[in-house]
Design a protein with these regions (language model features):
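Beta-barrel outer-membrane channel/assembly domains of diderm bacteria
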Residues: 205-317, 344, 413-422, 429-433, ...
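Solvent-exposed loop segments that connect transmembrane elements
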Residues: 292-293, 364-365, 400, 432-445, ...
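Parallel beta-helix/beta-solenoid
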Residues: 61, 138, 300, 334-337, ...
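Aromatic-lined carbohydrate-recognition surfaces of secreted/lumenal glycan-active proteins
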Residues: 320
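Signature for the C-terminal beta-barrel architecture of outer-membrane proteins
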Residues: 311-317, 325-486, 539, 550-552, ...
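Exposed loop/turn and edge beta-strand positions of beta-sandwich/beta-sheet ligand-binding modules
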Residues: 79, 156, 171, 256, ...
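Short, flexible, surface-exposed loop segments at domain boundaries
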Residues: 2-11, 15-214, 286
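Short coil/turn motifs at secondary-structure junctions
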Residues: 61, 88, 138, 165, ...
Length: 627
């Protein structure tokens, strides 16, 4: 990357950065007049009259910030308070719970969780209770049943119907429940219709992506504009990537990244644009053979507009430069592509379809710039603990090489019990792939018939320190025709699976932060590879996690090619055993606004490399601030 390229990229992106605001300025008067009180990104299950169970915390202004909302479709829970008894008035037979005055009548049933009956005199400050009853207009809560809970912790939960809904800013809504203003933001989880967790309100294009900027009440300017930001510092140290004991190689790279985002929303119209800046300074381990390099850039990022409920209810149209993300990042993640994209959702079914290219970013590899992408994703939540997804990716390359993969994938995600989670990704690749024959100079184009899979499970016994244990296996098929002698032409279809080129292969495995689940150091593309992984993790506190992983790498077909890794060394092509790697990942996120991650990797070369090959290591520390 050179500064000249990045400046040119920024200039060429200017029209796209101005596209959303230009359209907004033309449409905003009409949209402002017709803007409904209900936020366009609020989940359709949240309507006036719906019975909800809200878990959260009180704020100094008396409002209730929702962490999680569960929609009770049957509507048979009534009204409930779940929290700590704050005070007791024996003469009036009243309690204070979650700020509510609870009137205990002679016919109120009081019991422990074991169904053992107790009396009013057993109710004392500090006890965690569940109160069932009804709130009267004056605010007093008349108790029908009071149950003393067994485990004591500071619970704050209310249950009742949604009385009203109001928009409070970009990505913000206020629900009225039991007379309390309940604040809903992009960090609020929703569980509805026996489905999985998802954001109760959405602003951007993705759900659950840790790389998204954070929208809160603090970064709102007026009712229709939010200014977001992120600052990230990273230090990476890579040693011995060539596995050569006779040379000192590697580098230390401190880097600083900054992002500023601007989101504006009028009714069903949302426009978003962002600017990015980065600076990297590379220090080689051996100054006698390499020189220091310093690179900085400033460029445009996402710039799109979204029309919700267009062209019909449950549909959204998005046009502009936008990110593509899916939960396991196995097919695609976080590549800004210039796209026309349609989202749809109805009940437990959701889909998206798009056509995209990379029009402006000249710093990308040629594979991205020359491809027209057609992407489709379908998700069906069979029940709360089981989901089925299907993916289709076609990257049409009109150059002479005709590298045009066509990937069809199927995914199953399951969380059948509180102790077990599993996943299974199956993919088939068709299309065409070309390569230049170094002997003849001829471009050889072959059809592709390849396959890949990634299956695994995580077990959580739910005991002290919240340990977890993971086992997984991944396979990307290879092709023995790639090992032919020079000048000999391959025949038949190419059996080598290649990922889309848009993937990042990251996950968290019950951790606070995500990491490269195929290895922090090797971090390979899943092509001509078999990867066996064992992992163990601890979650001693909600904001802290530790993960230890072991990976074993084998080539499906012995080859001298190793795609997209941190290593400079090439395997011999005689032995399939590439080696093994140990990874350690520590994550700490005490607040949504701050995250610290520490990662380390130790790669031990196997029989595919020379006998005197020595290990390679990598260590990374990253601090992130969102505001």
């Amino acid at each position: 990357m050179t500064p000249g390229w990045t400046v040119r990229t920024a200039r060429s992106a200017v029209p796209f950065l101005l596209l959303g605001p230009a359209i907004l300025s033309a449409l905003s008067p009409a949209l402002a007049e017709s803007s409904p009180g209900r936020p366009s990104g609020l989940a359709p299950q949240l309507i006036v009259g719906a019975e909800v169970e809200v878990k959260g915390k009180f704020r100094p202004d008396g409002s209730f910030l929702a962490d999680q909302i569960v929609v009770n479709r049957n509507g048979d829970q009534g009204e409930e308070l779940r929290g700590i008894i704050e005070s007791v008035d024996p003469q009036a037979r009243r309690l204070k719970v979650l700020g509510f005055t609870v009137q205990v009548w002679p016919d109120t049933r009081v019991s422990r969780e074991s169904e053992e009956p107790v009396s009013f005199e057993d109710l004392a400050p500090g006890l965690r209770v569940k109160v069932e009853g009804r709130r009267f207009p004056g605010g007093t809560f008349r108790a029908k049943k009071i149950r003393i809970r067994q485990n004591m912790y500071p619970e704050q939960k209310i249950v009742g119907p949604v009385e009203s809904i109001a928009r409070s800013g970009v990505g913000l809504a206020v629900l009225q429940v039991l007379g309390l203003p309940v604040v809903v933001n992009v960090m609020t989880d929703l569980v509805a219709e026996n489905g999985p967790r998802r954001p109760a309100i959405s602003v951007g294009l993705t759900a659950g992506d840790e790389d998204d900027l954070l929208i809160t009440e603090r970064n709102q300017i007026g009712d229709h504009l939010a200014v977001l930001g992120e600052l990230r510092f990273r230090y990476e140290s890579l040693s011995n990537p060539d596995l050569d004991p006779s040379a000192v190689d590697g580098q230390d790279v401190p880097a600083l990244f900054g992002i500023a985002g601007f989101a504006t929303e009028f009714g069903t119209f949302l426009a978003y644009a962002e600017a990015l800046g980065e600076h990297e300074h590379s220090f080689p381990k051996d100054l006698s053979t390499d020189e220091e390099t310093e690179v900085g850039s400033a460029r445009g990022g996402q710039a799109y507009f979204r029309l919700a409920h267009f062209p019909g209810s449950g549909l959204s149209l998005v046009v502009g430069r936008q990110k593509f993300y899916e939960t396991r990042r196995w097919y695609y993640d976080n590549r800004n592509l210039d796209a026309v994209r349609m989202f749809g959702e109805h009940g437990r079914v959701a889909f998206q379809v798009s056509v995209s290219r990379d029009l402006f970013d000249e710093t990308r590899n040629q594979r991205d710039q020359d491809a027209t992408n057609r992407i489709a994703e379908f998700r069906w939540d069979l029940r709360r603990d089981l989901a089925l997804q299907a993916f289709y990716l076609n990257r049409e390359d009109r150059t002479e090489l005709r590298n045009s993969p066509e990937i069809l994938g199927l995914r199953v995600l399951g969380d059948p019990r509180t102790h077990l989670e599993f996943w299974a990704d199956l993919a088939h690749e068709g299309g065409t792939r070309g390569r230049l024959d170094s002997t003849t100079g001829e471009v050889i184009v072959r059809d592709v018939q390849a396959h890949a899979l990634d299956v695994g499970l995580t077990y959580r016994p739910r005991i002290v320190l919240d340990p977890s244990f993971t086992a997984s296996f991944a396979l990307g098929s290879g092709d023995d025709q790639l090992t032919l002698p020079a000048g000999q032409q391959p025949h038949g279809a190419d059996g080598t699976f290649r990922q889309s080129g848009l993937q990042r292969n990251r996950g968290s495995l019950n951790g606070v932060v995500s990491f490269h689940y195929y290895g922090e150091l090797l971090d390979p593309e899943l092509t001509n590879l078999r990867i066996q992984t064992l992992g163990a993790g601890l979650r001693p506190a909600r904001p802290l996690s530790l993960n230890l992983l072991f990976h074993r790498y084998l080539q499906d077909v012995p080859s001298r090619r190793l795609e997209n890794t941190e290593l400079d060394a090439k395997p011999s092509g005689l032995d399939p055993h590439l080696g093994s790697e140990w990874d350690l990942v520590v994550g700490y996120e005490p607040r949504n606004e701050f995250e610290l991650r520490l990662t380390g990797g130790y790669f031990q070369p196997g029989g595919a490399f020379p006998a005197d090959a020595t290990p390679s290591t990598i260590a990374t520390v990253q601090a992130r601030f969102r505001f």
